[in-house]
Amino acid sequence: MRYSVLNFSVGPYERLARRWRTFEELGFDGAWIADDLNVPGYADFESWALLAALARETTRMRIGTLISTVRLRHPTFLAAQVVSVDHISGGRAAVGIGAGEPEQNARVGNPLWSARETLERLDEQAGILAALLRGQPIAHDGPFYPTVVEAMPQPITRPRPPLLIAAHGPMGLRAAARHADVWNCLGGQPYGAGPNPDRSADRSLPEAAAEVERLMARLDEACAAVGRDPTTLGRSILAFIPERVTDPFESVDAFDALVGAFAHLNLEEITFYWPPLDMAFREPPSPADEARFERIAAHRILDRPAGPGATLATPKEA
């Protein structure tokens, strides 16, 4: 099992850099940046420029976005950003993509897309990225992203930086089955839960684990439908913590409860929010919060038995 952390791209930069150095010192296997722009009341850096800088603050962790929404970038531009960070980091880049949220269209001047069009775009973007991240030329005549790229820099990571797709519904799961190296979901909580005032659908840990298990069964079916061996597709979760579930960095027992709830699923990676999601939109963690986080991470991440590897798996051949 790998443990990673998701951080928001809120400055000042010096605090982010210090935090990422701490993540690595505490033994986290990866660190992710949430990728968005112009969120109301939320002064965020551009994620890939930020990752290029944070790559120089770290030496070991796999780094990337969780997720880069298909609503913000053309896939050729995103591929160039990923490969650039792969070189700057010495071969540690990964990229997560997903459908994102409808309001993101307006932030970059795009018309609103239907849910179906958004997921069709996700599938098309994933196919383009799957080729370009290998450094392959491409001539693609798709409906949304007609693309001709004659040359791409070869990545340091071979055969390519890992491509993660976050998906919950049938079309997204099929896109993951076709193109992804790793699938991700929101820890069994309702999609789009986020900082949502309506929390009536939030699930307990056993309920959330059961939902992840159901999604994994549907993912296996999607793999079968496209002729892919499901064992070649990694599985991961983002541990979204609703109010009815104690944050895993409240105590060692809370950490063990969350990890234990998903242990039977043989996940490849669990990603935790830090700071917690509710702090991303208000004041940062207090020194006491940070000290508790570091203490629990030291007990359960830094001091764990040596595992099979320290980074998110590179692509497996289907």
Where are these regions (language model features)?
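Active-site-adjacent structural elements that line small-molecule/cofactor binding pockets in enzymes
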Residues: 1-318
